[in-house]
């Protein structure tokens, strides 16, 4: 799902269904497992931890499959498809969407990512404090190919903070959450 966790979608019979009764039943049944209700903010944190990109937030029509690390899903052996010529011409380029870890600050949207020498290299598209990882994390858009870069600075309202630039997802690459 949107959070990178294993889950379920429930469908109902409409008028013959009580969402409130189901909600109460699930909370009661989950007490032993310490199930609690949460909100969209917790889902947002999990989305970032899982490295799940959101169209319109983390990327838009300016990005191609190479920029997003999705080239393995392109069948270049196929005789033709819309955009094939442009993708072949561009060639395999490094990803422009990466992650950052910032132990001293919670990154927020539009915070500026800089190289260690202060050059602007990108910006935060989604950020949060990760209770699981005990650090600030963010998805960042890089202005150009910086796949080999591993350290940088984050300019926020509170100052400049050291960050580690990393691949996504931040953890659970095999999508095993919840762990049995």
Where does each model-flagged region fall?
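Glycine-rich, acidic
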Residues: 1-91, 95
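Glycine-rich, small/acidic residue-mixed loop/short-helix segments
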Residues: 63-180
């Amino acid at each position: 799902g949107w959070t990178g966790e294993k889950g379920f979608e429930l469908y109902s019979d409409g008028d013959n269904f009580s969402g409130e009764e189901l909600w109460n039943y699930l909370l009661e049944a989950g007490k032993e497992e310490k199930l609690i209700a949460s909100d969209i903010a917790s889902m947002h944190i999990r989305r970032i931890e899982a490295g799940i990109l959101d169209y319109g937030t983390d990327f838009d029509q300016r990005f191609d499959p190479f920029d997003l690390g999705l080239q393995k899903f392109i069948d270049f052996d196929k005789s033709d498809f819309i955009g094939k010529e442009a993708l072949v011409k561009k060639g395999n380029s490094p990803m422009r969407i990466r992650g950052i870890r910032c132990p001293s600050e919670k990154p927020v949207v539009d915070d500026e990512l800089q190289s260690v020498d202060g050059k602007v290299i990108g910006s935060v598209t989604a950020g949060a404090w990760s209770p699981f990882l005990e650090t600030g994390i963010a998805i960042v858009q890089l202005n150009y190919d910086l796949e080999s870069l591993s350290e940088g600075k984050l300019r926020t309202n509170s100052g400049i903070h050291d960050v580690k630039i990393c691949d996504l997802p931040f953890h659970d690459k095999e999508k095993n959450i919840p762990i049995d």
